[in-house]
Amino acid sequence: MSARVLTKPQGLSISVKVVPGASKTVIVGFEGDFVKIRLAAPPVDGKANRELIDYISKLLSVPKSKVHIQSGLTSKRKVIRIENDDGTKLREILSSFESTEPVKRS
């Protein structure tokens, strides 16, 4: 696994590329060093950012208050910080995408 997930003493950081306005919210694979996530919410008034935080929170079973957009609030490329998480569950989820074809750039 490349630099998609970085574990730090205070938690972990994950680099994501989001595609808002999709039919459903789901991880679809990787694009370079980014985890590619389709979001059902549109990129309007922070709806896509809220959807991303909700999705990561539910996916990792952590409170929403522990999930933050560290950088990229207005960009498709973001760094998400999850407080007090060692990354075990996230790495397990992402490992299922490691053997699949790379996601093509859109």
Which ranges hold each PLM region?
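Contiguous, often N-terminal, cationic amphipathic patches that form binding interfaces
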Residues: 1-46, 50-54, 62, 68-73, ...
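The alpha-helix within a helix-turn-helix
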Residues: 57
